Amino acid sequence: MFGKGGMGNLMKQAQMMQEKMAKVQEEIARMEMVGESGAGLVKVTMTGAHTVRKVEIDPSLMEDDKEMLEDLIAAACNDAARRIEENQKTKMAEVTGGMQLPPGMKMPF
């Protein structure tokens, strides 16, 4: 069915891919991305594990409406999370050779 050594080679390839994916997942968890809103007036630094490390607010916003500032912080967090997701997809595509995952399935499994 798999030919000479086909099943063994397939298992070896799967193991190698799994090892590469584990390395990439560790790399992703350590990376940091900066999300911005309000043309850079609010910046949020987030890790690949979606932990917020830092929030920077331009002093000019401290005099403005509290609700607007809250909205800008939320938008910056969402921007950072979106950037992390895009980066994860790119890195995982490199490991899987562009192999698409079934809809709704995320990495890590």
Curated annotation (Swiss-Prot):
SUPFAM superfamilies in the record: YbaB-like
Subcellular localization(s) per the UniProt record: Cytoplasm, Nucleoid
Xref: Gene3D superfamilies: Nucleoid-associated protein YbaB-like domain
InterPro entries: YbaB-like_sf, YbaB/EbfC
Cellular component, GO annotation: bacterial nucleoid; cytosol
Domain of life the protein comes from: Bacteria
Coiled-coil ranges (or none): none
Keywords: Cytoplasm, DNA-binding
Location, primary (coarse class): cytoplasm
Record text on subunit structure and interactions: Homodimer.
Descriptive protein name: Nucleoid-associated protein Sbal223_1770
Species of the source: Shewanella baltica (strain OS223)
